[in-house]
């Protein structure tokens, strides 16, 4: 794999709440299905192929490392108890049906909070889409190019639909469980070579299963991990049903009682059609370098930069700093506002705690433990209107540190590391992969899995390649 080029299309500015679509909105779902079904590997630009390979690499590291977590083991036991066919790999737990493997691997993918994110849609696309694509690719003995195409097609559906309903959708719904159900169905449908009518049915059946509520964040419940797993499972189910002739709602997006009306206060259908078939959304993908909520990442980067510049220890920070304030954007604040997390998972969704830990030298590139910073400064978190105005095209933060001698230092950032606008190299993603997989499965397996990822384009049979990585 080569590095992505720095000059990437970035997500457009916030939604207007108006519906604007060059295609009649009454034909919106059908138009999307036609483009997804017709896509071929030759349609993918070179950059999109590279970005798809990078996304698979980034996903696999999180999925393998997460597969030994308690929540992943629970999902694996449930899948094993179903006692169904052995069509696809369950990381760290043998084999299951394609849908069962996708469920278990989807859960594992999202546990560490190191899987990718897309700014405009707020979808963690890899965790639901790639497990669905890999499981069906194994079952169908698809080659690597068919698999990569399916992943890109899945991202295309999920990210465009997520952008169309955000930001209002995000108030209650977790787009990784909702919009990505469409993406998983599209990826599975691509591998099954569904025609346009069948793809339309698959999208219809996917949409009626789309779910995932933010209430998990109130107590750090494992339900968040279930969202991508169930989206992957439901996507395969929708595509398999469509192949059999099972019909789905033909206007599941734009219908009077469809996805748009049910799950958002406003929508912009042009987000689905703008550049459809020519501009691939996977090239807008963002990679996470910190194992916590993406809304904290710009602020964490600023805190780490502040500490590095001064070479301070945690004791120095506590001694020298009088006040710390982080300003962020409104929708992100609603997710990371908890200033007194009581559990490890709540800590990952606490801006104040994450920034305090960063200032005290906690490394977020690996899974980190709650309470790792034994003493840490108080961080005040507020919403800034100018930063909210930049969202979701940017995920900005402003950090103001006041020292005890009266010095005030203010830094700001619009894009954390790992965004297309602030990119990481493929070498850095490979280093992240090895740092996640090596400690869990050993360096030999880590390098073997890395090799499988970097050679996917030339793979003749995904089942043969991925059944041997563990």
Model features per residue range: what roles?
Residues 1-11, 15-122, 218, 223-233, ...:
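Terminal-appendage/accessory-domain detector
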Residues 28-32, 51, 78, 145-157, ...:
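Extended, well-ordered alpha-helical scaffold segments
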Residues 66, 84-86, 157-165, 209-216:
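Secretory-pathway/luminal and periplasmic proteins that interact with or process carbohydrate-rich
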Residues 94-112, 148-163, 198-209, 262:
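Short, charged, amphipathic alpha-helices and their helix-cap/turn boundaries
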Residues 110-163:
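Hydrophobic alpha-helical hairpins/lids featuring a short glycine-rich hinge
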Residues 121-127, 147-151, 169-181, 226-228, ...:
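Active-site nucleophile and cofactor-binding loops and adjacent substrate-binding regions
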Residues 127-134, 180-187, 233-236, 296-298:
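Well-ordered alpha-helical segments within folded domains of soluble proteins
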Residues 140-146, 163-172, 185, 189-202, ...:
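Active-site cavity-forming subdomains of large catalytic enzyme subunits
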